[in-house]
Amino acid sequence: MSNLDILEARLRAVEDQLAIYQLVCGYGYAVDGCNTQAVGSLYAPDGVYAVADFATMEGRERIAGITNEEGHRTLVGRGCGHMSTLPYVVIDGDRAVATCHTMVVEHRAEGFGVARLSASRLQLSRKPEGGWQIDHRQNFMLDGGAAGPALLARLQQGPAPLTP
């Protein structure tokens, strides 16, 4: 491998990492802005968003549709922010996993407070048309149960094997 090939591979790795960071943090801005199109663009057409104590949403349209739900609109109307910490990313070719904390901060009479704190694991893939999208996102509340810490403990595990 030539020095130029090595440099190109390193640059691509950095670009992939930055693109995944943008994707992970972009969800909060899009969902708080009730931007259905932007939320949808983050997910593969058959993407899944599984929130352990809430619901499993399947398909880009269903996931993006959360921005139009009454409960979400009420939360946004009171003042809230969906935030992600900087993810730990493992890239394996055209597939990747990002592990992070996510939280919902909401406005309350006494000021702002964390309403939800979750462990999140996102499985992503590079799409043929370019860019990365979320194939599967799993959240577990960090409420003292075992599932959240167990998910975070897997941070160095790469993407799950593809199933036929």
List PLM regions with ranges.
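A solvent-exposed, acidic/Ser-Thr-rich amphipathic alpha-helical stretch
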Residues: T36-T102
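Short beta-strand edge/turn micro-motifs at domain boundaries
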Residues: V97-T99, L117-A153
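Flexible low-complexity loop/turn motifs enriched in small/helix-breaking residues
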Residues: I91-R95, L151-P164
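Short, low-complexity N-terminal intrinsically disordered segments enriched in polar/charged residues
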Residues: M1-Y29, G33, S41
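Short beta-strand segments enriched in hydrophobic/aromatic residues
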Residues: V31, Y43-A44, T102-V104, Q138-M141
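Exposed loop/turn and edge beta-strand positions of beta-sandwich/beta-sheet ligand-binding modules
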Residues: M83, V114, S118
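Short, cysteine-centered beta-strand-loop-beta hairpins and adjacent loop/turn segments enriched
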Residues: V105-V114
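C-terminal-biased regions
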Residues: I6, C80-L86, V105, M141, ...
